[in-house]
Swiss-Prot record:
Belongs to the LuxS family. This is S-ribosylhomocysteine lyase. GO terms for biological process: quorum sensing. GO terms for molecular function: iron ion binding; S-ribosylhomocysteine lyase activity. It catalyses: S-(5-deoxy-D-ribos-5-yl)-L-homocysteine = (S)-4,5-dihydroxypentane-2,3-dione + L-homocysteine. Keywords: Autoinducer synthesis, Iron, Lyase, Metal-binding, Quorum sensing. The lineage of its organism: Bacteria, Pseudomonadati, Pseudomonadota, Betaproteobacteria, Neisseriales. Binds 1 Fe cation per subunit. InterPro entries: LuxS_sf (IPR037005), Metalloenz_LuxS/M16 (IPR011249), S-ribosylhomocysteinase (IPR003815). Involved in the synthesis of autoinducer 2 (AI-2) which is secreted by bacteria and is used to communicate both the cell density and the metabolic potential of the environment. The regulation of gene expression in response to changes in cell density is called quorum sensing. Catalyzes the transformation of S-ribosylhomocysteine (RHC) to homocysteine (HC) and 4,5-dihydroxy-2,3-pentadione (DPD). It is an enzyme of class 4 (lyase). It comes from Neisseria meningitidis serogroup A / serotype 4A (strain DSM 15465 / Z2491).
Amino acid sequence: MPLLDSFKVDHTRMHAPAVRVAKTMTTPKGDTITVFDLRFCVPNKEILPEKGIHTLEHLFAGFMRDHLNGNGVEIIDISPMGCRTGFYMSLIGTPSEQQVADAWLASMQDVLNVKDQSKIPELNEYQCGTYQMHSLAEAQQIAQNVLARKVAVNKNEELTLDEGLLNA
């Protein structure tokens, strides 16, 4: 099985919260697709609670689009990582890490402004596969943590995993 790009970075050196360009690719039509690693937690030290990350998934996707889409950028998808330390965001375009960080911080403020669990989008059995597994309070605690710590930038060249550690 091929070694995926996400496993070629040293998770012991990652900062969080932090944004990282995980991958860029060019489509046959010439569009650039950029995948960002939006790391909310320090790997192997912190983890996002399951109800909070699920609620954040519902809120974050819309709020990030509000703040980042436009001027050659269109978000394709924002999905939580299986390790529950962050999200991957795929988009058309090449915004800077700072633009992404600014949109992320603005989105976290938006999460704090949600007044009631009933305001979580798609919170019903028809649009959500686990609609009862939500916590606005946990999502807001995650948002508060990001706002308090700010968003750094993780650079790939600083995180390259030593080949001797591969498959260790």
